[in-house]
Regions:
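Single conserved hydrophobic/aromatic residue that forms the stacking wall/gate
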Residues: 1-12
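Structural signature of hydrophobic alpha-helical transmembrane segments
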Residues: 2, 46-60, 186-195, 232-239
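Short helix-perturbing small/polar motifs within transmembrane alpha-helices
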Residues: 15, 28-42, 60-69, 225-230, ...
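Cytoplasmic-side transmembrane-helix entry/capping segments in multi-pass membrane proteins
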Residues: 19-28, 78-85, 213-220, 237-239
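Membrane-interface helix-loop-helix junctions at boundaries between adjacent transmembrane segments
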Residues: 21, 32-60, 64-120, 256, ...
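Hydrophobic alpha-helical transmembrane segments
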Residues: 22, 51-59, 120-124, 169-173, ...
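Hydrophobic core segments of alpha-helical transmembrane domains in multi-pass membrane transport
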Residues: 29-33, 58-65, 88-98, 121-136, ...
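Membrane-embedded hairpin module used as a gating/binding unit in multi-pass transport
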Residues: 105-197
C-alpha cells in the first residue's frame, strides 16, 4: 500500500499499525530539546520536571502529525523539511509560554574543529561506496539518473520509486560529495553539525534533492556572504547553507536563478528565526525555509 505522509514522501506503509507515522515520528524528534528543557534545565522540585518533560514530549508527538498535514499547504511542497517548519511553529508556542512566566531560554554553541582529516576520510569512503554500489547493481543507469535530474524535487518525490535503487544510490553519493566539497570550499570544519547537514543532503538524494537543484541554493548563500555582515564559514551560516537545500525544489521548478535567490534570502531568515523558538527546534533552517 502506498501513501503520501505529512513529510511529503510517497512511500510504502510498514507492516505495523504505527507504520504510517514512523517517518513523521523520526522527523518530530527535532523538538527533543524541549523535553530536556522541561525535565532538567528548569530544575523543578522532585520528579515534577521529569514528569512534565515526558508530558511535553508526548504532547509534541500528538500535535505534530495533524499540524504538519495542515501546514504542508502553506509552502505547497517547495520546502522538503515540512516537519522542520511545523516544529518551528510549535516550538515558538512552547517557548512563548515559558517566556511569559519569566523563564528565558539560553543558547549554548559547541563547535569543534581540527578533525577534518579523520571525518573527511570517513565521508569520502561512505559516499564513494554508495556510488560504486549503485554502479554495480543496476543497468540503464545513465537514463535513470537523467530522469532524476529532470525532477523538480517538489513534495519529496520518491526517486527510488521513480528511477530505481541503483540510480538513487548514485545520486545519494553525489549529493554527499557536493555537501562535503562545499564545507571544504568555504574553509568550514567537519564536525557534528556540519556532518549532520551533509548527511541530510545525501539522505534526501533519495527523495527530492540532486545536483541540479541544490547547487544554486548553496551558491545563493555564498553570494550573500559578499554583501552581508557575516562570514561564509560562520557556524550559523554554514548550517543555513547545508540545511537550506530544503528549498531545492524552487531551483528544480523555476530554474537555477530562483534557486540562487532562495538561498540568498534564506541565509538571512535562518539567522533570525532561531530567536522565535529559542533554539528548541533542531531543524531551524527547515522552519525558515
Amino acid at each position: 500500500t502506498r501513501f503520501r505522509n505529512v513529510t511529503g514522501v510517497q512511500t510504502c506503509a510498514l507492516p505495523i499499525s504505527f507504520g504510517e507515522h514512523v517517518y513523521t515520528a523520526l522527523f518530530a524528534t527535532s523538538l527533543s530539546p524541549i523535553v530536556t528543557e522541561f525535565a532538567f534545565v528548569l530544575q523543578l522540585p522532585g520528579r515534577a520536571g521529569i514528569l512534565l518533560g515526558i508530558f511535553i514530549g508526548v504532547s509534541v508527538g500528538l500535535i505534530i502529525p495533524p499540524l504538519a498535514a495542515h501546514l504542508k499547504v502553506v509552502h505547497k511542497g517547495y520546502s522538503l523539511y515540512n516537519i522542520g517548519f511545523t516544529a518551528g511553529i510549535l516550538g515558538t508556542v512552547y517557548v512563548s509560554l515559558l517566556r511569559s512566566y519569566g523563564y528565558q531560554t539560553g543558547f549554548n554553541m559547541i563547535w569543534s574543529d581540527g578533525n577534518d582529516r579523520l571525518f573527511l576520510g570517513f565521508l569520502l569512503l561512505l559516499f564513494i561506496f554508495f556510488i560504486l554500489l549503485g554502479l554495480c547493481s543496476g543497468r540503464g543507469l545513465a537514463s535513470s539518473l537523467k530522469t532524476i535530474f529532470r525532477q523538480s524535487g517538489r513534495s519529496c518525490e520518491d526517486f527510488i520509486e521513480l528511477s530505481g535503487i541503483s540510480a538513487s544510490l548514485v545520486n545519494i553519493g553525489i549529493n554527499g560529495l557536493i555537501g562535503t566539497a562545499y564545507v571544504l570550499l568555504v574553509c568550514g570544519p567537519l564536525n557534528g553539525p556540519t556532518i549532520g547537514g551533509i548527511l541530510t543532503i545525501a539522505g534526501f538524494g533519495a527523495c527530492g534533492k540532486h545536483a541540479r537543484n541544490i547547487i544554486p541554493v548553496l551558491f545563493g548563500v555564498m553570494l550573500g556572504s559578499l554583501t552581508k555582515v557575516w562570514n561564509i564559514n560562520d557556524p550559523a551560516v554554514l548550517l543555513a547553507a547545508l540545511f537550506g537545500t530544503s528549498l531545492a525544489p524552487i531551483a528544480g521548478r523555476y530554474g537555477w536563478a530562483w534557486g540562487v535567490v532562495a538561498g540568498f534570502l534564506n541565509s538571512s531568515v535562518a539567522l533570525c528565526s532561531s530567536a522565535l523558538h529559542g533554539g528548541m527546534n533542531l531543524y531551524n533552517t527547515g522552519f525558515s525555509a
